[in-house]
Amino acid sequence: DDFVLKTFAGKTFMDVFNAFYYSWSPAVAEAEYSNPALRETVKYMIYPLIGSLQLSRIAAEPLAAVSSELSVISAGVVVSNLLGIIYLAPISLLVRRFLLSRKRLPVTAPRLAWLMMVLLPILATAVYFQNGAVVAFASSALVLGGLCLGCALPYTIAKALASMRSR
């Protein structure tokens, strides 16, 4: 937390994240308190989150020598992709397999990667000029894009591998 909160981008994003998180987490905490099985489930589901946060920090640490802002933004991109892969991709693959097997979805990994590449200079410019509103928007959009990209990557990779095998 301290690593993130020492930067303008990190603090601004955490303000947005905390507003979102604390809008629903008290209800979950209350449900956990009265349900030991739910408490155990949540406990085990948090382990990958903690590991992802640690990995993203390790991956971004070398960039701190260049810029702490760049380091925090990189950590956010890494962790959002990892969380998309860990938490969203399995659900997405099941939904795609059983409910949307014949439909072509317009959201693809290359489009999401393009979106993230567009957001990065917007975020960098907003950080440079210390524009809190744009940083809040761009950092949140970047994290959501990273979650979606992480969600789309396993399907994209599996599809590419299947295509290579069929040649």
Where are these regions (language model features)?
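Long, compositionally biased charged/polar accessory segments in the mid-to-C-terminal portions
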Residues: 1-167
